[in-house]
Protein backbone atom coordinates (compact mmCIF):
# COMPACT_ATOMS: atom_id res chain seq x y z
CA UNK A 1 0.00 0.00 0.00
CA UNK A 2 1.06 3.55 -0.68
CA UNK A 3 2.27 5.48 2.35
CA UNK A 4 0.48 8.81 2.94
CA UNK A 5 3.83 10.52 3.51
CA UNK A 6 5.52 9.70 0.22
CA UNK A 7 5.98 12.39 -2.42
CA UNK A 8 3.23 12.31 -5.02
CA UNK A 9 2.42 14.61 -7.94
CA UNK A 10 0.62 17.73 -6.88
CA UNK A 11 -3.14 17.68 -6.86
CA UNK A 12 -5.85 20.07 -5.71
CA UNK A 13 -5.91 18.32 -2.33
CA UNK A 14 -2.23 18.88 -1.62
CA UNK A 15 -1.02 22.24 -0.37
CA UNK A 16 1.44 23.35 2.29
CA UNK A 17 -1.51 24.30 4.51
CA UNK A 18 -2.69 20.66 4.72
CA UNK A 19 0.50 19.21 6.22
CA UNK A 20 2.73 19.94 9.20
CA UNK A 21 5.68 22.27 8.53
CA UNK A 22 8.11 19.31 8.44
CA UNK A 23 6.33 17.65 5.49
CA UNK A 24 6.99 18.75 1.95
CA UNK A 25 5.69 17.83 -1.43
CA UNK A 26 7.20 17.86 -4.87
CA UNK A 27 6.36 20.65 -7.28
CA UNK A 28 5.82 20.10 -10.96
CA UNK A 29 6.00 22.79 -13.59
CA UNK A 30 2.26 23.29 -13.42
CA UNK A 31 2.03 23.90 -9.71
CA UNK A 32 1.50 27.35 -8.20
CA UNK A 33 4.26 29.35 -6.59
CA UNK A 34 3.76 27.87 -3.11
CA UNK A 35 7.07 26.42 -1.96
CA UNK A 36 7.91 25.14 1.45
CA UNK A 37 11.56 24.28 0.91
CA UNK A 38 13.00 26.38 3.73
CA UNK A 39 15.25 25.52 6.62
CA UNK A 40 13.99 24.81 10.10
CA UNK A 41 15.49 28.03 11.44
CA UNK A 42 13.59 30.10 8.90
CA UNK A 43 10.37 28.36 9.85
CA UNK A 44 10.65 29.81 13.35
CA UNK A 45 10.31 33.36 12.07
CA UNK A 46 7.11 35.22 12.81
CA UNK A 47 4.60 35.99 10.11
CA UNK A 48 5.76 39.57 10.08
CA UNK A 49 9.31 38.51 9.20
CA UNK A 50 8.19 36.03 6.56
CA UNK A 51 6.20 38.62 4.63
CA UNK A 52 9.28 40.73 4.08
CA UNK A 53 11.68 38.04 2.85
CA UNK A 54 10.63 36.96 -0.63
CA UNK A 55 7.66 37.00 -2.91
CA UNK A 56 8.13 33.59 -4.48
CA UNK A 57 8.71 31.55 -1.31
CA UNK A 58 6.25 31.20 1.48
CA UNK A 59 6.82 29.15 4.62
CA UNK A 60 4.11 28.09 6.97
CA UNK A 61 4.68 28.60 10.67
CA UNK A 62 3.14 26.65 13.45
CA UNK A 63 0.00 28.71 13.36
CA UNK A 64 -0.42 27.92 9.67
CA UNK A 65 -0.93 24.19 10.19
CA UNK A 66 -4.49 23.19 9.54
CA UNK A 67 -5.55 26.57 8.11
CA UNK A 68 -7.27 26.98 4.76
CA UNK A 69 -5.48 28.06 1.62
CA UNK A 70 -7.05 31.51 1.80
CA UNK A 71 -5.67 32.17 5.27
CA UNK A 72 -2.11 32.64 4.02
CA UNK A 73 -3.16 35.25 1.49
CA UNK A 74 -5.20 37.01 4.14
CA UNK A 75 -2.22 37.15 6.50
CA UNK A 76 -0.02 38.53 3.73
CA UNK A 77 -2.56 41.22 2.87
CA UNK A 78 -3.01 42.10 6.53
CA UNK A 79 0.71 42.74 6.95
CA UNK A 80 0.85 45.10 3.96
CA UNK A 81 1.57 48.64 5.15
CA UNK A 82 0.91 51.94 3.44
CA UNK A 83 2.61 55.30 3.74
CA UNK A 84 0.76 57.56 6.16
CA UNK A 85 1.56 60.60 4.02
CA UNK A 86 0.88 59.61 0.40
CA UNK A 87 -0.78 56.16 0.79
CA UNK A 88 1.92 54.49 -1.32
CA UNK A 89 3.36 51.16 -0.19
CA UNK A 90 5.39 51.69 2.99
CA UNK A 91 9.02 50.62 3.04
CA UNK A 92 9.46 50.81 6.79
CA UNK A 93 8.70 52.54 10.05
CA UNK A 94 10.63 55.82 10.00
CA UNK A 95 10.33 59.06 11.97
CA UNK A 96 7.50 57.61 14.03
CA UNK A 97 5.14 56.49 11.25
CA UNK A 98 4.93 53.99 8.38
CA UNK A 99 6.28 55.77 5.31
CA UNK A 100 7.52 55.12 1.80
CA UNK A 101 11.09 55.80 0.69
CA UNK A 102 10.10 59.04 -1.04
CA UNK A 103 8.33 60.64 1.92
CA UNK A 104 11.00 59.43 4.32
CA UNK A 105 13.75 61.03 2.24
CA UNK A 106 11.70 64.21 1.76
CA UNK A 107 11.11 64.60 5.50
CA UNK A 108 14.78 63.92 6.21
CA UNK A 109 15.86 66.64 3.78
CA UNK A 110 13.30 69.06 5.20
CA UNK A 111 14.38 68.74 8.83
CA UNK A 112 18.10 68.70 8.11
CA UNK A 113 18.25 71.65 5.76
CA UNK A 114 16.76 75.13 5.85
CA UNK A 115 13.46 75.10 3.98
CA UNK A 116 11.18 77.96 3.01
CA UNK A 117 8.41 75.98 1.34
CA UNK A 118 5.49 78.12 0.19
CA UNK A 119 2.22 76.72 -1.12
CA UNK A 120 1.22 78.35 -4.43
CA UNK A 121 -2.44 77.65 -3.72
CA UNK A 122 -4.44 77.64 -0.47
CA UNK A 123 -2.37 75.34 1.79
CA UNK A 124 -4.88 72.57 1.09
CA UNK A 125 -3.19 70.60 -1.70
CA UNK A 126 -4.01 66.91 -1.98
CA UNK A 127 -1.01 64.75 -1.17
CA UNK A 128 -1.21 61.25 -2.62
CA UNK A 129 0.97 58.89 -4.60
CA UNK A 130 0.61 60.83 -7.85
CA UNK A 131 0.62 64.39 -6.50
CA UNK A 132 3.02 64.22 -3.59
CA UNK A 133 5.70 66.16 -5.48
CA UNK A 134 3.39 68.96 -6.58
CA UNK A 135 3.57 71.00 -3.34
CA UNK A 136 6.43 70.68 -0.86
CA UNK A 137 4.76 72.92 1.72
CA UNK A 138 1.59 70.85 1.93
CA UNK A 139 3.60 67.64 1.85
CA UNK A 140 5.68 68.73 4.83
CA UNK A 141 2.57 69.91 6.65
CA UNK A 142 0.95 66.52 6.13
CA UNK A 143 4.11 64.82 7.41
CA UNK A 144 3.68 66.71 10.68
CA UNK A 145 -0.06 66.06 10.76
CA UNK A 146 0.36 62.28 10.55
CA UNK A 147 2.90 62.39 13.37
CA UNK A 148 6.34 62.36 11.75
CA UNK A 149 8.90 63.65 14.21
CA UNK A 150 12.64 64.13 14.17
CA UNK A 151 12.95 62.10 17.36
CA UNK A 152 11.23 59.14 15.75
CA UNK A 153 14.18 58.21 13.50
CA UNK A 154 15.65 54.77 13.98
CA UNK A 155 19.24 54.90 15.12
CA UNK A 156 19.99 51.44 13.77
CA UNK A 157 20.31 51.39 10.01
CA UNK A 158 21.09 47.68 9.69
CA UNK A 159 18.64 45.04 8.57
CA UNK A 160 17.82 43.55 11.96
CA UNK A 161 15.09 40.98 12.44
CA UNK A 162 12.11 42.42 14.22
CA UNK A 163 12.00 39.39 16.47
CA UNK A 164 15.48 40.20 17.79
CA UNK A 165 14.57 43.86 18.18
CA UNK A 166 11.49 42.95 20.17
CA UNK A 167 13.54 40.69 22.41
CA UNK A 168 16.15 43.38 22.90
CA UNK A 169 13.49 45.95 23.71
CA UNK A 170 11.87 43.64 26.22
CA UNK A 171 15.15 42.93 27.99
CA UNK A 172 16.07 46.62 28.01
CA UNK A 173 12.70 47.50 29.50
CA UNK A 174 13.09 44.84 32.18
CA UNK A 175 16.55 46.07 33.09
CA UNK A 176 15.33 49.67 33.25
CA UNK A 177 12.43 48.67 35.48
CA UNK A 178 14.82 46.82 37.78
CA UNK A 179 17.15 49.81 37.84
CA UNK A 180 14.21 52.11 38.56
CA UNK A 181 13.05 49.97 41.50
CA UNK A 182 16.53 49.73 43.03
CA UNK A 183 17.46 53.38 42.49
CA UNK A 184 17.23 55.96 45.30
CA UNK A 185 14.05 58.08 45.41
CA UNK A 186 15.75 61.21 44.09
CA UNK A 187 17.22 59.33 41.11
CA UNK A 188 13.83 57.75 40.50
CA UNK A 189 12.22 61.18 40.21
CA UNK A 190 14.87 62.30 37.74
CA UNK A 191 14.31 59.19 35.63
CA UNK A 192 10.56 59.66 35.51
CA UNK A 193 10.86 63.32 34.56
CA UNK A 194 13.29 62.57 31.75
CA UNK A 195 11.05 59.80 30.46
CA UNK A 196 8.03 62.11 30.37
CA UNK A 197 9.94 64.84 28.56
CA UNK A 198 11.03 62.41 25.87
CA UNK A 199 7.49 61.30 25.15
CA UNK A 200 6.29 64.49 23.48
CA UNK A 201 2.77 65.90 23.52
CA UNK A 202 0.84 67.79 26.17
CA UNK A 203 2.05 65.65 29.09
CA UNK A 204 5.73 66.28 28.36
CA UNK A 205 7.60 68.96 30.22
CA UNK A 206 8.54 71.88 28.02
CA UNK A 207 11.43 72.83 30.29
CA UNK A 208 14.72 71.71 28.80
CA UNK A 209 13.40 71.24 25.27
CA UNK A 210 15.44 72.68 22.45
CA UNK A 211 13.78 75.28 20.20
CA UNK A 212 13.75 72.81 17.31
CA UNK A 213 11.94 70.23 19.44
CA UNK A 214 9.36 72.81 20.48
CA UNK A 215 8.76 73.83 16.86
CA UNK A 216 8.32 70.21 15.78
CA UNK A 217 5.78 69.54 18.53
CA UNK A 218 3.85 72.71 17.73
CA UNK A 219 3.67 71.85 14.04
CA UNK A 220 2.64 68.30 14.80
CA UNK A 221 -0.20 69.55 16.99
CA UNK A 222 -1.89 71.50 14.20
CA UNK A 223 -5.51 70.44 13.55
CA UNK A 224 -6.71 69.39 10.09
CA UNK A 225 -8.59 71.68 7.72
CA UNK A 226 -12.30 71.02 8.18
CA UNK A 227 -15.26 70.98 5.81
CA UNK A 228 -18.51 72.82 6.42
CA UNK A 229 -20.77 70.23 4.71
CA UNK A 230 -23.65 72.73 4.82
CA UNK A 231 -25.85 72.73 1.72
CA UNK A 232 -27.05 76.33 1.81
CA UNK A 233 -27.59 78.14 -1.47
CA UNK A 234 -26.19 81.53 -2.35
CA UNK A 235 -26.81 84.40 -1.97
CA UNK A 236 -26.65 84.00 1.78
CA UNK A 237 -29.10 85.67 4.11
CA UNK A 238 -28.36 86.85 7.63
CA UNK A 239 -29.66 83.62 9.11
CA UNK A 240 -27.90 81.28 6.68
CA UNK A 241 -24.61 83.16 6.98
CA UNK A 242 -24.63 83.07 10.78
CA UNK A 243 -25.68 79.41 10.71
CA UNK A 244 -22.67 78.59 8.54
CA UNK A 245 -20.21 80.53 10.67
CA UNK A 246 -21.43 79.33 14.06
CA UNK A 247 -21.55 75.72 12.87
CA UNK A 248 -17.95 75.95 11.68
CA UNK A 249 -16.89 77.67 14.92
CA UNK A 250 -18.41 74.88 16.99
CA UNK A 251 -16.57 72.24 14.95
CA UNK A 252 -13.30 74.11 15.22
CA UNK A 253 -13.65 74.48 18.99
CA UNK A 254 -13.56 70.71 19.38
CA UNK A 255 -10.34 70.52 17.36
CA UNK A 256 -8.95 73.54 19.20
CA UNK A 257 -9.25 71.69 22.51
CA UNK A 258 -7.48 68.68 20.99
CA UNK A 259 -4.78 71.03 19.67
CA UNK A 260 -4.24 72.61 23.09
CA UNK A 261 -3.87 69.20 24.71
CA UNK A 262 -0.98 68.43 22.34
CA UNK A 263 0.96 71.55 23.29
CA UNK A 264 4.03 70.60 25.35
CA UNK A 265 3.31 71.18 29.01
CA UNK A 266 -0.37 72.04 28.65
CA UNK A 267 -1.73 68.87 30.27
CA UNK A 268 0.58 69.42 33.22
CA UNK A 269 -1.43 72.52 34.12
CA UNK A 270 -4.39 72.24 36.44
CA UNK A 271 -7.81 71.74 34.90
CA UNK A 272 -8.82 75.21 36.10
CA UNK A 273 -5.90 76.81 34.26
CA UNK A 274 -6.50 74.82 31.08
CA UNK A 275 -10.14 75.87 30.95
CA UNK A 276 -9.43 79.51 31.77
CA UNK A 277 -6.82 79.82 29.03
CA UNK A 278 -9.18 78.31 26.46
CA UNK A 279 -12.15 80.41 27.54
CA UNK A 280 -10.11 83.61 27.39
CA UNK A 281 -8.59 83.13 23.95
CA UNK A 282 -10.79 80.80 21.90
CA UNK A 283 -11.94 83.33 19.31
CA UNK A 284 -8.43 84.75 18.87
CA UNK A 285 -7.10 81.24 18.23
CA UNK A 286 -9.84 80.59 15.66
CA UNK A 287 -9.17 83.93 13.97
CA UNK A 288 -5.44 83.44 13.56
CA UNK A 289 -6.18 80.01 12.10
CA UNK A 290 -8.58 81.64 9.63
CA UNK A 291 -5.91 84.20 8.73
CA UNK A 292 -3.34 81.47 8.12
CA UNK A 293 -5.66 79.52 5.83
CA UNK A 294 -6.47 82.68 3.86
CA UNK A 295 -2.94 84.06 3.59
CA UNK A 296 -2.42 82.97 -0.03
CA UNK A 297 -5.86 84.06 -1.28
CA UNK A 298 -6.09 87.86 -1.41
CA UNK A 299 -9.60 89.15 -0.82
CA UNK A 300 -10.88 85.76 0.38
CA UNK A 301 -11.55 84.26 3.80
CA UNK A 302 -11.22 80.48 3.86
CA UNK A 303 -13.40 79.32 6.73
CA UNK A 304 -13.36 75.73 5.40
CA UNK A 305 -12.45 73.83 2.28
CA UNK A 306 -16.00 74.26 1.01
CA UNK A 307 -16.73 77.64 2.63
CA UNK A 308 -14.74 80.47 1.02
CA UNK A 309 -16.20 83.95 1.40
CA UNK A 310 -15.24 87.37 0.10
CA UNK A 311 -15.86 90.77 1.59
CA UNK A 312 -19.09 91.46 -0.28
CA UNK A 313 -20.78 88.35 1.14
CA UNK A 314 -20.44 89.77 4.63
CA UNK A 315 -22.87 92.59 3.79
CA UNK A 316 -25.84 90.30 4.37
CA UNK A 317 -25.21 90.44 8.13
CA UNK A 318 -25.27 93.75 9.96
CA UNK A 319 -21.80 94.54 11.28
CA UNK A 320 -20.14 91.55 9.62
CA UNK A 321 -18.55 93.54 6.78
CA UNK A 322 -16.50 95.54 9.29
CA UNK A 323 -15.14 92.35 10.85
CA UNK A 324 -14.40 90.92 7.40
CA UNK A 325 -12.47 94.09 6.52
CA UNK A 326 -10.34 93.79 9.65
CA UNK A 327 -9.65 90.12 8.98
CA UNK A 328 -8.65 90.79 5.37
CA UNK A 329 -6.41 93.69 6.41
CA UNK A 330 -4.61 91.58 9.02
CA UNK A 331 -4.26 88.73 6.53
CA UNK A 332 -2.74 91.15 4.03
CA UNK A 333 -0.24 92.30 6.65
CA UNK A 334 0.82 88.72 7.43
CA UNK A 335 1.11 88.10 3.68
CA UNK A 336 3.46 91.08 3.34
CA UNK A 337 5.60 89.68 6.15
CA UNK A 338 5.64 86.26 4.41
CA UNK A 339 4.57 84.47 7.55
CA UNK A 340 6.14 81.03 7.86
CA UNK A 341 4.66 77.90 9.38
CA UNK A 342 7.02 77.92 12.35
CA UNK A 343 6.14 81.54 13.13
CA UNK A 344 2.41 80.87 12.82
CA UNK A 345 2.39 77.93 15.25
CA UNK A 346 4.40 79.96 17.77
CA UNK A 347 2.07 82.96 17.54
CA UNK A 348 -0.97 80.72 17.92
CA UNK A 349 0.42 79.14 21.10
CA UNK A 350 1.46 82.56 22.42
CA UNK A 351 -2.12 83.81 22.02
CA UNK A 352 -3.41 80.92 24.13
CA UNK A 353 -0.83 81.23 26.90
CA UNK A 354 -0.70 85.02 27.03
CA UNK A 355 -4.46 85.25 27.60
CA UNK A 356 -4.06 84.16 31.22
CA UNK A 357 -0.43 84.75 32.02
CA UNK A 358 -1.21 88.11 33.61
CA UNK A 359 -4.45 88.81 35.43
CA UNK A 360 -4.77 92.56 35.06
CA UNK A 361 -8.34 92.63 36.36
CA UNK A 362 -8.44 90.32 39.34
CA UNK A 363 -11.97 91.47 40.13
CA UNK A 364 -13.36 89.89 36.98
CA UNK A 365 -11.03 86.95 36.32
CA UNK A 366 -9.79 84.32 38.70
CA UNK A 367 -5.99 84.17 38.79
CA UNK A 368 -4.30 81.11 37.39
CA UNK A 369 -3.41 78.42 39.89
CA UNK A 370 0.08 78.03 38.44
CA UNK A 371 0.90 81.26 36.66
CA UNK A 372 4.63 80.52 36.84
CA UNK A 373 4.22 77.33 34.79
CA UNK A 374 2.20 79.18 32.15
CA UNK A 375 4.84 81.90 32.05
CA UNK A 376 7.59 79.30 31.58
CA UNK A 377 5.69 77.78 28.67
CA UNK A 378 5.20 81.24 27.18
CA UNK A 379 8.91 82.06 27.53
CA UNK A 380 9.98 78.77 25.95
CA UNK A 381 7.71 79.22 22.93
CA UNK A 382 8.82 82.84 22.55
CA UNK A 383 12.44 81.65 22.61
CA UNK A 384 11.58 79.13 19.89
CA UNK A 385 10.13 81.94 17.77
CA UNK A 386 13.25 84.07 18.29
CA UNK A 387 15.45 81.08 17.47
CA UNK A 388 13.63 80.47 14.19
CA UNK A 389 13.85 84.13 13.18
CA UNK A 390 17.57 84.13 13.99
CA UNK A 391 18.11 81.38 11.41
CA UNK A 392 16.75 83.51 8.57
CA UNK A 393 20.18 84.95 7.75
CA UNK A 394 19.06 88.56 8.28
CA UNK A 395 20.90 91.10 10.36
CA UNK A 396 20.22 91.39 14.08
CA UNK A 397 18.30 94.62 13.53
CA UNK A 398 16.06 93.04 10.88
CA UNK A 399 15.45 90.04 13.13
CA UNK A 400 14.36 92.30 16.00
CA UNK A 401 12.06 94.25 13.69
CA UNK A 402 10.43 91.09 12.35
CA UNK A 403 9.83 89.77 15.83
CA UNK A 404 8.26 93.08 16.85
CA UNK A 405 6.07 93.22 13.73
CA UNK A 406 4.75 89.72 14.34
CA UNK A 407 3.98 90.25 18.01
CA UNK A 408 2.39 93.66 17.41
CA UNK A 409 -0.13 92.06 15.07
CA UNK A 410 -1.47 90.01 17.98
CA UNK A 411 -3.05 93.17 19.39
CA UNK A 412 -5.04 93.53 16.15
CA UNK A 413 -6.26 89.95 16.52
CA UNK A 414 -7.34 90.72 20.11
CA UNK A 415 -9.27 93.76 18.86
CA UNK A 416 -10.97 91.69 16.14
CA UNK A 417 -11.82 89.05 18.71
CA UNK A 418 -13.57 91.57 20.93
CA UNK A 419 -15.52 92.91 17.96
CA UNK A 420 -16.49 89.42 16.89
CA UNK A 421 -17.55 88.50 20.42
CA UNK A 422 -19.85 91.51 20.68
CA UNK A 423 -21.34 90.75 17.28
CA UNK A 424 -21.91 87.10 18.13
CA UNK A 425 -23.53 88.06 21.41
CA UNK A 426 -25.85 90.52 19.68
CA UNK A 427 -26.90 87.78 17.25
CA UNK A 428 -27.62 85.55 20.23
CA UNK A 429 -29.79 88.21 21.87
CA UNK A 430 -31.73 88.72 18.64
CA UNK A 431 -32.33 84.97 18.36
CA UNK A 432 -31.11 85.16 14.78
CA UNK A 433 -29.25 81.88 14.78
CA UNK A 434 -29.10 78.74 16.93
CA UNK A 435 -25.91 78.42 18.95
CA UNK A 436 -24.36 75.09 19.90
CA UNK A 437 -23.51 73.96 23.41
CA UNK A 438 -19.75 74.35 23.20
CA UNK A 439 -19.98 77.71 21.45
CA UNK A 440 -22.47 78.93 24.05
CA UNK A 441 -20.18 77.87 26.88
CA UNK A 442 -17.28 79.78 25.38
CA UNK A 443 -19.41 82.85 24.70
CA UNK A 444 -20.90 82.93 28.19
CA UNK A 445 -17.51 82.40 29.80
CA UNK A 446 -16.06 85.30 27.82
CA UNK A 447 -18.88 87.56 29.03
CA UNK A 448 -18.04 86.57 32.60
CA UNK A 449 -14.35 87.35 32.14
CA UNK A 450 -14.90 90.79 30.62
CA UNK A 451 -13.72 93.64 32.88
CA UNK A 452 -15.87 96.51 31.62
CA UNK A 453 -18.92 95.83 33.84
CA UNK A 454 -19.36 94.62 37.41
CA UNK A 455 -20.04 90.94 37.87
CA UNK A 456 -23.42 91.58 39.53
CA UNK A 457 -24.91 92.91 36.29
CA UNK A 458 -24.10 89.95 34.04
CA UNK A 459 -27.26 87.98 34.67
CA UNK A 460 -29.46 90.91 33.68
CA UNK A 461 -27.19 91.89 30.80
CA UNK A 462 -27.33 88.43 29.33
CA UNK A 463 -31.02 88.92 28.66
CA UNK A 464 -30.61 92.33 27.03
CA UNK A 465 -28.86 93.39 23.84
CA UNK A 466 -25.36 94.86 24.20
CA UNK A 467 -24.83 98.54 24.94
CA UNK A 468 -27.97 98.64 27.14
CA UNK A 469 -27.65 99.13 30.88
CA UNK A 470 -29.79 98.01 33.73
CA UNK A 471 -29.41 98.81 37.41
CA UNK A 472 -32.10 96.44 38.57
CA UNK A 473 -30.20 94.07 40.83
CA UNK A 474 -33.37 92.36 41.97
CA UNK A 475 -33.82 90.79 38.55
CA UNK A 476 -30.28 89.48 38.75
CA UNK A 477 -30.91 87.71 42.00
CA UNK A 478 -34.33 86.41 41.02
CA UNK A 479 -33.21 85.00 37.69
CA UNK A 480 -30.90 82.57 39.48
CA UNK A 481 -33.83 80.79 41.04
CA UNK A 482 -32.62 81.01 44.65
CA UNK A 483 -29.17 81.34 46.13
CA UNK A 484 -27.27 80.47 42.96
CA UNK A 485 -27.14 84.05 41.67
CA UNK A 486 -24.08 86.20 41.12
CA UNK A 487 -24.17 87.59 44.63
CA UNK A 488 -23.23 84.23 46.07
CA UNK A 489 -20.47 83.64 43.53
CA UNK A 490 -18.36 86.55 44.61
CA UNK A 491 -17.26 85.14 47.92
CA UNK A 492 -14.34 82.80 47.94
CA UNK A 493 -14.37 81.51 44.37
CA UNK A 494 -14.27 84.73 42.39
CA UNK A 495 -16.97 86.28 40.18
CA UNK A 496 -18.38 83.02 38.83
CA UNK A 497 -22.08 82.92 38.09
CA UNK A 498 -24.38 79.95 38.06
CA UNK A 499 -25.12 78.88 34.51
CA UNK A 500 -28.74 78.30 35.48
CA UNK A 501 -29.07 82.09 35.68
CA UNK A 502 -28.03 82.60 32.06
CA UNK A 503 -30.65 83.41 29.49
CA UNK A 504 -30.43 80.24 27.42
CA UNK A 505 -32.51 77.21 28.22
CA UNK A 506 -30.65 74.30 29.80
CA UNK A 507 -29.22 72.00 27.14
CA UNK A 508 -27.36 69.53 29.30
CA UNK A 509 -24.13 69.97 31.26
CA UNK A 510 -21.64 72.49 29.98
CA UNK A 511 -18.50 71.09 28.47
CA UNK A 512 -16.10 73.77 29.63
CA UNK A 513 -17.41 74.76 33.02
CA UNK A 514 -15.33 74.91 36.14
CA UNK A 515 -15.28 76.30 39.66
CA UNK A 516 -18.06 76.56 42.23
CA UNK A 517 -21.48 75.71 40.85
CA UNK A 518 -20.21 75.04 37.33
CA UNK A 519 -20.02 71.46 36.18
CA UNK A 520 -16.88 69.43 35.64
CA UNK A 521 -15.22 69.34 32.22
CA UNK A 522 -12.83 66.46 32.71
CA UNK A 523 -14.70 64.46 30.06
CA UNK A 524 -13.56 67.01 27.45
CA UNK A 525 -10.10 68.06 28.70
UniProtKB/Swiss-Prot annotation:
Chain segments carrying region Modulating:
1-82
Zinc finger intervals, NR C4-type: 83-103, 119-143
| Bias (Gly residues) ranges | 479-493
One GO CC term of this entry?
A: nucleus
The record's section on Pfam families has: Hormone_recep (PF00104), Oest_recep (PF02159), zf-C4 (PF00105)
Biased composition annotated in UniProt, kind: Basic and acidic residues:
154-182, 452-465
CDD domains noted in UniProt: NR_DBD_ER, NR_LBD_ER
Q: What GO annotations for molecular function exist for this entry?
A: hormone binding; nuclear estrogen receptor activity; sequence-specific DNA binding; steroid binding; zinc ion binding
Q: What positions does the domain NR LBD occupy?
A: 210-446
Chain segments carrying region Disordered: 1-59, 154-203, 452-525
Region annotation (Hinge) maps to 149-209
Where in the chain is the DNA-binding region found? 83-148
Summarizing the function annotation, the protein's role is: The steroid hormones and their receptors are involved in the regulation of eukaryotic gene expression and affect cellular proliferation and differentiation in target tissues.
Subunit text: Binds DNA as a homodimer. Can form a heterodimer with ER-beta.
Protein family (similarity comment): Belongs to the nuclear hormone receptor family. NR3 subfamily.
Q: What is this protein called?
A: Estrogen receptor
Naturally occurring in which organism (per UniProt): Micropogonias undulatus
Amino acid sequence: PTSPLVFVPSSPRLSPFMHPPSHHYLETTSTPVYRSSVSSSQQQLSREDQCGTSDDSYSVGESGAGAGAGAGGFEMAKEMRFCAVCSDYASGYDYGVWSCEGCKAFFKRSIQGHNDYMCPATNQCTIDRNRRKSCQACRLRKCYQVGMMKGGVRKDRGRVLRRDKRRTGTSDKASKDLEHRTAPPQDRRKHSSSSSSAGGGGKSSIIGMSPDQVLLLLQGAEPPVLCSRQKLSRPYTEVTMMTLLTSMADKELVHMIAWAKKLPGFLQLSLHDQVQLLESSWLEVLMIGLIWRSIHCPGKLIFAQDLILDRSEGDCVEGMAEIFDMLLATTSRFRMLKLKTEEFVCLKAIILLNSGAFSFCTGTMEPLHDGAAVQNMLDTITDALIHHISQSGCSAQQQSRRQAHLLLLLSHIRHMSNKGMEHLYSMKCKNKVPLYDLLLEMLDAHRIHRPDRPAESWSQADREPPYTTSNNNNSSSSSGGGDGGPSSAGSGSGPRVNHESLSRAPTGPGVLQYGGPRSDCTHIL
